[in-house]
Amino acid sequence: MFRFDKEQIVLDIAGTKIGGQPGEYPTVLAGTIFYGGHSIIEDEKAGVFDKDKAEALIKTQEEMSDVTGNPHIVQTFGQTPEAIVKYLEFVGDVTDAPFFIDSTSGEARIAGANYASEVGLEDRAIYNSVNMAADEAELEALKETKLSASIVLGFNPMDPTVDGKIGIWEDGAGTIDKGLLEMAAECGIDKYLMDVAVTPLGQGAGVAVRTSFAVKSKWGYPVGSGIHNVPSAWDWLREYKKDHKEAWPVCDVGSNLIQQMAGGDFVLYGPIENAKMAFPACAMADIFISEAAKDIGTEPVEDHPFFKLL
């Protein structure tokens, strides 16, 4: 195991601590709800859904968080402005946990950010994300909200190397006019969650994971990813699982452990239905890391899985 010379920044988002030295704080786990095709949704555009089932899913994640000691975030996805506001209103009522404001639509993301600001949920809200594709209108609108936390996505299609990813955060790497960190700061963001933008196997997945070390060595910011997307994009596994369904959850949930072992502070582990698999697996990895890091001067916090599960 390893310890960074750079002082590590620990974010406090509504009482949830994200960051620190490997083995110090437990990995924060975010499960996605209201994703495209989610069975609990009745109308994706209008945001009509089964509230009882949605609450049960969130409460299960909450319970697993209590059991293992791994804090949780509700990754709240919405396709439209109307839908995401309804989802955020619901999430804000049923849990005290932080939540991601997530959508493929910039208009929907801003609608969610505006809603969170208007009703006093800005301290729990995390924008997803400031990235190279964000246009001026979205950035200007984000600036007008009260949000202070955001994922900053290190995706650089022109140069997917470690240096290319660092560059897109630092100065734009010749691809955009300024670095993503500067762009985020101009929008009022001062709590950066650095997403290393893991791409498919054979197309830079390993490089993205290695970027985790670089981020924490250079800036000390919390780092993580939605690494579970890697198995989803693996053609061989998609074919193999047709006859071997048991292989899928092993790779899907297991991918998160790779991010953790590379110094990750948070993982977006996929559908919230996977909470009962993801939390024990990630808690186990945290115990491994913490035990290994003790000899080099890193002590786990009181509610770490090392103390809760041993």
UniProtKB/Swiss-Prot annotation:
UniProt GO molecular function? tetrahydromethanopterin S-methyltransferase activity
What domain of life is recorded for the organism?
Answer: Archaea
Q: Which reaction does it catalyse?
A: 5-methyl-5,6,7,8-tetrahydromethanopterin + coenzyme M + 2 Na(+)(in) = 5,6,7,8-tetrahydromethanopterin + methyl-coenzyme M + 2 Na(+)(out)
A Pfam family per the record? MtrH
Family per UniProt?
A: Belongs to the MtrH family.
Q: What does this protein do?
A: Part of a complex that catalyzes the formation of methyl-coenzyme M and tetrahydromethanopterin from coenzyme M and methyl-tetrahydromethanopterin. This is an energy-conserving, sodium-ion translocating step. MtrH catalyzes the transfer of the methyl group from methyl-tetrahydromethanopterin to the corrinoid prosthetic group of MtrA.
Q: What is this protein called?
A: Tetrahydromethanopterin S-methyltransferase subunit H
